[in-house]
C-alpha cells in the first residue's frame, strides 16, 4: 500500500456504520448483534469489562476479522467488498505494542514509514516529526528494550499515525499505564480529533470514557446494552448520586446493605477508600437513610449528593455484580 495523506472527511458524516455484527468462536458467541454509528470528527467510546467483546468488535470493524453476520461501512465503504480502500482510511493501535523492541524508536518509525511507501528522506522526516509530537525525541536512539510501558505505547500510537488516517481505532490504549502517562495519552487523542481525525476507543476505564468520549456504547456479553452521550447515560440511572464513607471499615458491608434496602437500588463499594456510591432518584431519601444508620449504630465519616457516575450507569444497566472485578472503577 503506497503512502498517501488522506483528505479528512466532513464533520458529521458517518465514519462507522455497523449493523448486526455477529462473531462466534466455536460455541461461544463473542459478539451478538452489535450496532454502532460513529460520526466523523468525534471520539466514540466502547465501554465494557474484559471479555465483553470490545476487541473482537474492533477487529471486525478494522478488516482484521470477518464477521459471521452483519455489515460495516467505513466512510461509506464496505469492509468486506472494499477492504483495500478501508485499510487506507484507518489506523489501528492495540493493547500490546506492535513495535520491534530490538530497534530504536527512530528505526521503528522509519521502517513503518518505508513499508507505507515513503522514500528514505521522507521516512526520516516523518519519524522526527512523530517523535517530537509524542515527546520521545530524547529517547529516539535508545533501544526499545529500555523503554517504559508508557513510552512503548506512545511509540505504537505514533506508528499508527504515519499515514495520518481519518479514522483511528484505539483498543484499550492506556491499559497498564500510570496516571501521568495516561493523561498524556488523553491529550494526544484530543489533539488528533482537533486536527480532523475520528477516534473509536475501547476501554475498561470508566473515567477514561467520561473524560474523552462524545458518545459511549456500553457492551456486555457481546451486546450493546446502552448508547448515548455521557450525560444521557448518567441521566438514565437517576438525577443524583449518593457518595458516603463509613468511620469503621468493618461496617462497610452493613452500610451497603442499608443503602440498598432504603434506596431500593444497587450500590458500589470502593474497598481502597471505604466509599459507597449509589444512584438516587429522590434526595429526600437521605433522611430515611440517616435514620436507618443511626438505628443500626453505623457512624458516617462523610456524605454527599452529586451527579450520577458512569460506575452507577454500568452497574444499573448490567445488573451484574461480577462485572465489578473486571471493569475498572478506580479514578485514574
What are the residue ranges of the model-derived segments?
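ABC-family P-loop ATPase nucleotide-binding domain
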Residues: 1-22, 320-332
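ABC transporter nucleotide-binding domains
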Residues: 13-16, 23-220, 224-226
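Preference for bulky hydrophobic residues occupying beta-strand positions
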Residues: 23, 36, 244-246, 278, ...
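Short, surface-exposed acidic/glycine-rich loop or hinge patches that mediate macromolecular interfaces
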Residues: 77-80, 224, 249, 283, ...
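ABC transporter nucleotide-binding domain
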Residues: 187-280
Amino acid at each position: 500500500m503506497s503512502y498517501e495523506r488522506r483528505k479528512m472527511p466532513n464533520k458529521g458524516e458517518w465514519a462507522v456504520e455497523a449493523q448486526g455484527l455477529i462473531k462466534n468462536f466455536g460455541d461461544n458467541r463473542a459478539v451478538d448483534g452489535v450496532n454502532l454509528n460513529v460520526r466523523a470528527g468525534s471520539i466514540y467510546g466502547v465501554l465494557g469489562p474484559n471479555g465483553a467483546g470490545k476487541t473482537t468488535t474492533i477487529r471486525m470493524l478494522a478488516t482484521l476479522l470477518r464477521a459471521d453476520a452483519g455489515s460495516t461501512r467505513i466512510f461509506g465503504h464496505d469492509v468486506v467488498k472494499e477492504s483495500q480502500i478501508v485499510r487506507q482510511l484507518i489506523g489501528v493501535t492495540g493493547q500490546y505494542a506492535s513495535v520491534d523492541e530490538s530497534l530504536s524508536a527512530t528505526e521503528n518509525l522509519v521502517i513503518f514509514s518505508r513499508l507505507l511507501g515513503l522514500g528514505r528522506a521522507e521516512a526520516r522526516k516523518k519519524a522526527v516529526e512523530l517523535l517530537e509530537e509524542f515527546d520521545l525525541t530524547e529517547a529516539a536512539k535508545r533501544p526499545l528494550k529500555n523503554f517504559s510501558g508508557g513510552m512503548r505505547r506512545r511509540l505504537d500510537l505514533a506508528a499508527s499515525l504515519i499515514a495520518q488516517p481519518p479514522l483511528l481505532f484505539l483498543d484499550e490504549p492506556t491499559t497498564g499505564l500510570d496516571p501521568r502517562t495516561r493523561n498524556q495519552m488523553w491529550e494526544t487523542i484530543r489533539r488528533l480529533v482537533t486536527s480532523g481525525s475520528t477516534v473509536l476507543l475501547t476501554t475498561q476505564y470508566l473515567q477514561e470514557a467520561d473524560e474523552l468520549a462524545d458518545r459511549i456504547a456500553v457492551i456486555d456479553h457481546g451486546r450493546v446494552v446502552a448508547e448515548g452521550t455521557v450525560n444521557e447515560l448518567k441521566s438514565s440511572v437517576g438525577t443524583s448520586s449518593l457518595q458516603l464513607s463509613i468511620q469503621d471499615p468493618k461496617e462497610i458491608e452493613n452500610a451497603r446493605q442499608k443503602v440498598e434496602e432504603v434506596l431500593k437500588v444497587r450500590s458500589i463499594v470502593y474497598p481502597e477508600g471505604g466509599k459507597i456510591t449509589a444512584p438516587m432518584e429522590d434526595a429526600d431519601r437521605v433522611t430515611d437513610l440517616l435514620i436507618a444508620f443511626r438505628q443500626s449504630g453505623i457512624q458516617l465519616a462523610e456524605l454527599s449528593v452529586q451527579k450520577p457516575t458512569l460506575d452507577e450507569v454500568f452497574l444499573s444497566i448490567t445488573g451484574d455484580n461480577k462485572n465489578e472485578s473486571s471493569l475498572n472503577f478506580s479514578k485514574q
